[in-house]
Amino acid sequence: MSLSPSPVIDEAALQRLRDLDPGGKNHLLERVLRAFETSVVRLGAQLVDARAKNDMQSVRHAVHTLKSSSASIGAMRLSRLCAEIEAAVRVEAFAGLPPLLDDVDRELVVVLQALLPLRDAPP
């Protein structure tokens, strides 16, 4: 059985993960989603700390990692926001970062909430 995913999470990405574990015997999707949740907590804290210290290279590192991991689980808006921040930091366009970082903070909450029913759903 498959729950209808939230529009926050791309179904095709989830299906690619499911396809790697036919029948769900290895609980791959659940494990990947739990690992994502754990990394989000760590990366979110790093992002808050880097932002408070105005450490743009640490911001860039955190969003780079978050960009890839969020894309892998289908959180495409979050991934795009992270890519936008990463590109801005790369060219030192810092003026527009505060609202983008706020968007990432909000989207992290939305993504984590969307993952809860997916993480515990049967394969």
Segment roles from a protein language model:
Residues 1-123:
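Two-component system phosphorelay core
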